[in-house]
């Protein structure tokens, strides 16, 4: 059984590195925004098998208060031997619910094109032209919450 738990940014780094950017130094997968994000791990027993990080932006409104309006998930990584077993679906469902609970009206990500069909299953659609991070093609995908 898969259990989703809040984790620290530091707990995400090894999996982010080994799955997403194994040819880069470990620091490549650390981002400045990590300290302000919400980080979740999918666990099988006590083994961390997938990670995702959620960042909620705030925008000033007429009252001067700052309210969440958009959420972005980043650094979504699943151990290869756990891919295509529903773990990513469980984790992304959790993040969609969390984004809604935090008041976001839009959830988006920079998606690797080889994962586009996965994101479409959640109702996400591409909203940008293809762009590259190194040799890897991406597009921005978005979901109205």
List the predicted regions and their residue ranges.
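Short hydrophobic/aromatic beta-strand element in the GNAT-like acyltransferase core
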Residues: 26-27, 37-41, 51, 75, ...
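Short amphipathic alpha-helix that is part of the acyltransferase structural core
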Residues: 1-48
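Conserved acetyl-CoA binding element of GNAT-fold acetyltransferases
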Residues: 64-80
